[in-house]
From Swiss-Prot:
Membership in a protein family: Belongs to the cation diffusion facilitator (CDF) transporter (TC 2.A.4) family. SLC30A subfamily.
Record-given protein name: Probable proton-coupled zinc antiporter SLC30A4
TM spans (from-to): 114-134, 144-164, 179-199, 217-237, 275-295, 311-331
UniProt keywords, alphabetically: Antiport, Endosome, Ion transport, Lysosome, Membrane, Metal-binding, Transmembrane, Transmembrane helix, Transport, Zinc, Zinc transport
Outcome of swapping residue 413 to F: Decreased homodimerization
MF terms (GO), sorted A to Z: antiporter activity; metal ion binding; zinc ion transmembrane transporter activity
Top-level taxonomy: Eukaryota, Metazoa, Chordata, Craniata, Vertebrata
Amino acid sequence: MAGSGAWKRLKSMLRKDDAPLFLNDTSAFDFSDEAGDEGLSRFNKLRVVVADDGSEAPERPVNGAHPTLQADDDSLLDQDLPLTNSQLSLKVDSCDNCSKQREILKQRKVKARLTIAAVLYLLFMIGELVGGYIANSLAIMTDALHMLTDLSAIILTLLALWLSSKSPTKRFTFGFHRLEVLSAMISVLLVYILMGFLLYEAVQRTIHMNYEINGDIMLITAAVGVAVNVIMGFLLNQSGHRHSHSHSLPSNSPTRGSGCERNHGQDSLAVRAAFVHALGDLVQSVGVLIAAYIIRFKPEYKIADPICTYVFSLLVAFTTFRIIWDTVVIILEGVPSHLNVDYIKEALMKIEDVYSVEDLNIWSLTSGKSTAIVHIQLIPGSSSKWEEVQSKANHLLLNTFGMYRCTIQLQSYRQEVDRTCANCQSSSP
């Protein structure tokens, strides 16, 4: 340290002018041989050189700012030097390149969870039907019926994920997305038929009261049902799997906040919906367990069994009504409930060089896949800008409003000339 200080004082005394010291970034960093000749400590990879010749110095700005050093490839550190964490964080993978692979992995995890849930639902639904039949309990069988609705929903979700990877054919140019809607209609109709049969039996038991229930089997089956639904809740719960991976960027980076920060553990709506259904099943199973406990220890209150059937039938009807309504809207090619046609028209009219929006038709191929056909008239004299208008309208429909497909027809505005139909003239008095 003493030798280094003496060297600095000697260099200051020998300076020809009062110009400030500067770093010479035009020389290579590896000067270990020169350092040894001058008696300085050797640097393995880097040595800062103090230049005396003012001609080598960068031009000093008049405003007193720090001089800007020009980039020089020769001034980089040797490759075997370890990089710091901040240097490593600047190497960012493009989110656009990995988003497709990430989506595939996400769908694979969703399919695995839903498949396991479907298998458990199927096995226990069969077990409940057998247990309810042996125990002569309509409440147990109604609980199995409610589980059938959840099983159908999971199967439809898996079907939708499978169909999304299928390409359209020459006959089915839109693909096979409507198959999901058809399957939903069939499954709901099957549930309603079974529910009608159970309600009829419940009414007969309420009127005649000539039936016996095996309280032990009913209690065991109901207890297993609660346990299975708790397991389903843990299986489908995603709160413990949320973790955000963000690509590290410096705070002043122009790309920060521009979409490179993603939540890689984003929840799946399909799994979340199945989790909500599992919670509903858990509540219903607890109700069946309470009824089984009452019937087991108080057989004279066996009326609790048909009462549970009435309550759970209403619950099944309530949960399936939305499916029926959405299916009818899709079949009739109605506008999806989350889209507003007037608002979309206003947004299209705000595009530059758009004169009017003549036709706007919106419908759904299936749940979550909306399609639009729009006819736009351009301002007279702006036909040369049709590509720009089409690009903006396409981006608005697909990205802003989340359309699955859209078709845009462009036409220059032409004032209509009143023409009287010859048939109308001949028929008029």
